């Protein structure tokens, strides 16, 4: 039960950071205070950092909401998600 609650709280924090309601720096500070030094803290901080960099709704090379395509329409280019970043007219080289 405790593990499930911890995971649920962490996912909530990641959501708050990715939406921009709280700064990444503030969440990183909270993680530094609450988690012991080690692999768990480093993994949690890495996940928060990656999610905070989310741009135009891109997640794991998928344009979840179509924001990347809409963003690149202004340039008359195709919007392609590269991880969590949106790039206009730049195909993914490793596919």
UniProtKB/Swiss-Prot annotation:
Cited InterPro entries: Long_scorpion_toxin_alpha/beta (IPR029237)
Region forming the signal peptide: 1-19
Q: State whether keyword Signal applies.
A: yes
Q: Which residues form a coiled coil?
A: none
* UniProt key word Cell inner membrane: no
Provide the free-text tissue specificity comment from this protein's UniProt record: Expressed by the venom gland.
Query: Which residues does the UniProt record annotate as the domain BetaSPN-type CS-alpha/beta?
Result: 55-94
- Top-rank taxon of the source lineage equals Eukaryota
Q: Name one GO cellular component term.
A: extracellular region
- What biological process terms from GO does the record include? defense response to bacterium; defense response to fungus; killing of cells of another organism
Question: What keywords are annotated for this sequence in UniProt?
Answer: Antibiotic, Antimicrobial, Cytolysis, Disulfide bond, Fungicide, Ion channel impairing toxin, Potassium channel impairing toxin, Secreted, Signal, Toxin, Voltage-gated potassium channel impairing toxin
**Where does this polypeptide localize?**
Secreted
Q: Which Pfam families match?
A: Scorpion_toxin_alpha-beta
User: Which GO molecular-function terms appear in the entry?
Assistant: potassium channel regulator activity; toxin activity
**Which cysteine pairs make disulfide bonds?**
58-81, 68-86, 72-88
- Family membership noted in the UniProt record: Belongs to the long chain scorpion toxin family. Class 3 subfamily.
What is the protein name given in its UniProt record?
A: Hge-scorpine
Q: Taxonomy-wise, where does this protein's organism fall, top ranks first?
A: Eukaryota, Metazoa, Ecdysozoa, Arthropoda, Chelicerata
